[in-house]
């Protein structure tokens, strides 16, 4: 039962502390172990999928992939209407009801989120069927406080409604759940 957990730990360690280049055979073995879906399924432990949802500002660069496998998406919200340009929303975030109401009333935002949800739902179903444990979805905008936060919150809410474990982080406003 501990093998799947050991594989996840090995995966995280191999990312945090890569093996030296002069050990290519060992690097290949670690890569094969980490990539083995069979080893991840051994034992009675049921491995659950966790979707990591993140909001961020493009000003500070793309977020790091903590899972190490790179599975998921980065969505650019800068094309959506920007509440940050309106004085009344300047000090608020996408978590505040006034900003959420503004963005929810915009057809482009609703269409965008519907499409993102459909895409992520397909991936969640696929990942669950293959016993994958990590999927990342990041939303970026100019300041990382309004549009990206709102979109991350809505996706997290949607996924939790489907019974999916969600880790939600807002890099620029320093909070999440």
Tell me the role of every PLM-derived stretch:
Residues 156-166:
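Post-Walker A helix-loop "phosphate-sensing" segment adjacent to the P-loop in P-loop NTPases
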Residues 133-156:
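Catalytic cysteine-centered active loop of the rhodanese-like fold, especially the PTP/DSP P-loop
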């Amino acid at each position: 039962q501990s093998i799947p957990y050991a594989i996840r730990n090995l995966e995280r360690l191999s990312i945090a502390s890569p093996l030296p280049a002069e050990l290519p055979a060992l690097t290949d073995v670690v890569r094969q172990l980490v990539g083995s879906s069979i080893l991840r399924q051994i034992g009675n432990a049921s491995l659950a999928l966790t979707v990591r949802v993140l909001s961020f500002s493009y000003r500070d660069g793309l977020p790091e992939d903590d899972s190490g496998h790179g599975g998921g998406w980065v969505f650019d919200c800068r094309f959506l209407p920007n509440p940050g340009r309106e004085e009344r929303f300047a000090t608020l975030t996408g978590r505040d009801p006034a900003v959420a109401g503004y963005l929810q009333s915009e057809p482009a935002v609703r269409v965008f989120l519907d499409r993102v949800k459909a895409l992520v739902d397909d991936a969640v179903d696929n990942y669950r069927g293959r016993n994958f444990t990590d999927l990342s979805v990041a939303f970026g905008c100019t300041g990382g406080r309004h549009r990206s936060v709102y979109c991350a919150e809505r996706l997290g809410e949607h996924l939790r409604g489907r019974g999916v474990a969600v880790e939600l982080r807002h890099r620029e406003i320093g909070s999440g759940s």
